[in-house]
Swiss-Prot record:
Basic and acidic residues: bias regions: 7-27
Pfam families per the UniProt record, alphabetical: HD, HD_assoc
Protein family per UniProt: Belongs to the dGTPase family. Type 2 subfamily.
Disulphide bonds in the chain: none
Annotated ranges, domain HD: 59-255
NCBIfam families (UniProt xref): antiphage_dGTPase, dGTP_triPase, PRK05318.1
Keyword Hydrolase attributed: yes
Signal peptide residue numbers: none
Keywords of this entry: Hydrolase
Name of the protein in its database record: Deoxyguanosinetriphosphate triphosphohydrolase-like protein
A single BP term in Gene Ontology: dGTP catabolic process
Length: 449
């Protein structure tokens, strides 16, 4: 691993700022933190819909917690594995990945993602992680054409699914819907990968890898998605070391902190915990889990807030300290050869918590109704803009659309870029202005998003 090649940026920079002694990864973190795309996460749905309650987490607070957990994982691994200090050379790098990991997710959570994927079904699809890659490398206006122009290693770390859409897509066996209201998310799952429109950037990121490493890293397999009964598409198999830490931090935050929101709001009950989670923890093959977590439900569902917070801290600490570094010696590049993984018994425990959130929170009819509503809003907006882009799109977006048309590129991607960047509230308001007679004649004039 030659650090210099992984610190390269796609567009060379010669900025000489007075007394600026920051590392390349500290600069990356600053660009992400100060970006408009990051700020908009404060008004995007995490699990519970924006506006339901002031307590729960948004995608912004979730990302901050993922960052805190990610650096905690790195600190633990530094102590456990001093021989891998070169791999764990920068906390700023891991903070960058964790802060940016959700930056491409559209309004209304999974509902918005499925809606955009359906509307883009003949134009390369849509998926939140692919959009994150695109925002960082192309869309965010830190530079004219290179997005935030982040370091190559940062871009490698954000690649949760390192293969293009065309390599992963498998056509599903379902009939074309005749009305948007009939769209079922289970029949239109997004392909987990990079958009083919961004293959040039993808190739640049992988440039330092040997041919063998590149081929294996981007290889695919048939596989199911944990949240879907039938996932028809192929799946990627590998991720980089940095990405593995970010993904574990994301999983822990999702399973533990989103569970906390659900408990506080009364969505998940103590009886559901004792039915769905407690037996797995009590019968765990790990002594610590049996001793420390078997009775943790009493604290989690306590009416005394400090006891619940203590239980949440115990859960997070348990998972963070159970992470180890595994090695796949087929890879030559250390960033691919090594991955952070959870010890098996803790992986089982984490999965049980994730399933609890999915079963009682995500699948809750009231939450699904919000997703469905968001789905309809996003499809309605896309259909309107696609019908007459030069009439309805904001002026700057019209210009991007025209350039795309003139260059023979995928102009529908411009529509997906615009809509996916909206917050829940902005998308809902725009939908009302377009389709509701009661919205009045005063259409909101706002600066380009």
């Amino acid at each position: 691993m030659t650090s210099s090649v992984w610190q390269e940026r796609r567009h060379g920079e010669d900025k000489q700022r007075r007394n600026d002694h920051r590392s390349p990864y500290q600069r990356d973190r600053a660009r992400i933190l100060h970006s408009a795309a990051f700020r908009r996460l404060q008004a995007k749905t995490q699990v519970l819909g924006v506006g339901m309650n002031d307590f729960y987490r948004t995608r912004l607070t979730h990302s901050l917690e993922v960052s805190q957990i990610g650096t905690g994982i790195a600190a633990q691994l530094r102590r456990k594995y001093p021989q891998h200090k070169q791999l764990l050379c920068s906390m700023s790098l891991l903070e960058s990945l964790c802060l940016a990991h959700d930056i491409g997710h559209p309004p209304f959570g999974h509902g918005g993602e499925v809606a955009l994927n359906y509307m883009m079904r003949d134009h390369g699809g849509f998926e939140g992680n692919g959009q994150t890659f695109r925002i960082l490398s192309k869309l965010e206006p830190y530079t004219l054409d290179f997005g935030m122009n982040l370091c190559r290693r940062t871009m490698l770390g954000i690649l949760k699914y390192p293969a293009p859409h065309s390599k992963l897509f498998v056509a599903g066996e379902h009939n074309e819907i005749t009305n948007h209201r009939q769209l079922k998310p289970s029949q239109w799952p997004p392909v987990k990968g990079i958009f083919d429109d961004d293959n040039d950037i993808f190739a640049w990121v992988l440039e330092p890898l040997s041919e063998a490493d590149r081929s294996r890293f981007t290889s695919t397999q048939q596989g199911s998605h944990p949240a879907l009964h039938h996932y028809p598409h192929l799946r990627t198999q590998f991720k980089s070391f940095d990405c593995s830490i970010m993904e574990l931090a994301d999983d822990i935050a999702y399973a533990v902190h989103d569970l906390e929101d659900a408990i506080v709001m009364g969505i998940v009950t103590a009886s559901q915990w004792h039915q769905d989670v407690a037996p797995t923890l009590t019968n765990s093959g790990d002594t610590w889990i049996r001793q420390e977590l078997a009775d943790i439900g009493n604290k989690l569902f306590s009416h005394e807030h400090h006891l619940r917070k203590d239980a949440i801290g115990t859960l997070v600490n348990g998972f963070v300290t159970a992470i180890v570094i595994s090695e796949d010696d087929v890879f030559e590049e250390p960033l691919l050869r090594f991955n952070a993984t959870l010890e098996p018994e803790f992986a089982i425990a984490l999965n049980v918590l994730k399933q609890l959130v999915y079963k009682y929170v995500i699948r809750k009819p009231e939450i699904q109704m919000l997703e469905y509503k968001g789905q309809q809003i996003v499809m309605g907006l896309f259909e309107a803009f696609a019908s007459d882009p030069e009439r309805l799109l904001p002026l700057n977006t019209q210009e991007r659309w025209r350039e795309s048309e003139q260059q023979g590129l995928n102009s529908h991607r411009v529509l997906a870029d615009y809509i996916s960047g909206m917050t829940d509230e902005f998308a809902g308001r725009l939908y009302q202005q377009l389709f509701s007679p009661k919205a009045g004649s005063n259409v909101e004039l706002s600066k380009e998003m």
